[in-house]
Amino acid sequence: MSFAEKITGLLARPNQQDPIGPEQPWYLKYGSRWLGIVAAFFAILFGLWNVFSIITLSVSCLVAGIIQMVAGFVVMLLEAPCCFVCFEQVNVIADKVDSKPLYFRAGLYIAMAIPPIILCFGLASLFGSGLIFGTGVVYGMMALGKKASAEDMRAAAQQTFGGNTPAQTNDRAGIVNNAQPFSFTGAVGTDSNV
């Protein structure tokens, strides 16, 4: 058994479909899940640190810490539902989110990560919520998909526009056919030089 198969076996849930699809490499699929688990752990830890800032009478940091801890629990619930065995509906919620497109998860993670940073800008909120934000960015990049092959990009670049005329590739090609190039030789006659 290879190292990749061991990692995929550890991170796969029972009866789990492949929601991301075969086009994503294994290290991106499971790396994003690992990043989400680590981000959730640190968000909960640093959210607790922000909650202790009530000692300095900073209510906004208290609220930011609570939001950050809730965001950490939500990310942990979605990325590793095995951590919440005592709740019966966790797998249902995780499967429902897994069935949605990846940009939904990316938007959810990014939206949950921004408020604690705005409310209490500091290293604890920046690092804890920043990891959740990074997980959302990784899922967003996965939602965009892979770049096309070189042959596909060349074929798309050589397609004709308007039927018979090939695409123009010189420097003077513009949107308007009769457009004149800019002249940088002198000032315009109506310029007041002010």
Curated annotation (Swiss-Prot):
UniProt-annotated site: Calcium ion selectivity, residues: 79
Regulation of its activity: Channel activity is inhibited by La(3+), which reduces Ca(2+) influx and thus inhibits it's function in promoting activity-dependent bulk endocytosis (ADBE) in response to high stimuli.
Function: Transmembrane protein which mediates synaptic endocytosis, fitness-based cell culling, neuronal culling, morphogen gradient scaling, and calcium transport. Regulates synaptic endocytosis and hence couples exo- with endocytosis. Controls two major modes of synaptic vesicle (SV) endocytosis in the synaptic boutons of neuromuscular junctions (NMJs); Ca(2+) channel-independent Clathrin-mediated endocytosis (CME) in response to mild stimulation, and Ca(2+) channel-dependent activity-dependent bulk endocytosis (ADBE) in response to strong stimulation.
Subcellular location: Cell membrane; Cytoplasmic vesicle, Secretory vesicle, Synaptic vesicle membrane; Presynaptic cell membrane; Endosome
GO biological process entries: bulk synaptic vesicle endocytosis; cell competition in a multicellular organism; clathrin-dependent synaptic vesicle endocytosis; photoreceptor cell differentiation; positive regulation of neuron apoptotic process; positive regulation of presynaptic cytosolic calcium concentration; synaptic vesicle endocytosis
Gene name linked to the record: flower
Subunit structure: Homomultimer. Associates with the dally/ magu complex.
Coiled coil: none
Family: Belongs to the calcium channel flower family.
Keywords: Calcium, Calcium channel, Calcium transport, Cell membrane, Cell projection, Cytoplasmic vesicle, Endocytosis, Endosome, Ion channel, Ion transport, Membrane, Synapse, Transmembrane, Transmembrane helix, Transport
Membrane spanning stretches: 35-55, 66-88, 107-127
Major subcellular site: membrane
Single GO molecular function: calcium channel activity
InterPro entries xref list: TVP18/Ca-channel_flower
Protein name: Calcium channel flower
Bilayer topology term: Multi-pass membrane protein
GO CC term (a single one): synaptic vesicle membrane
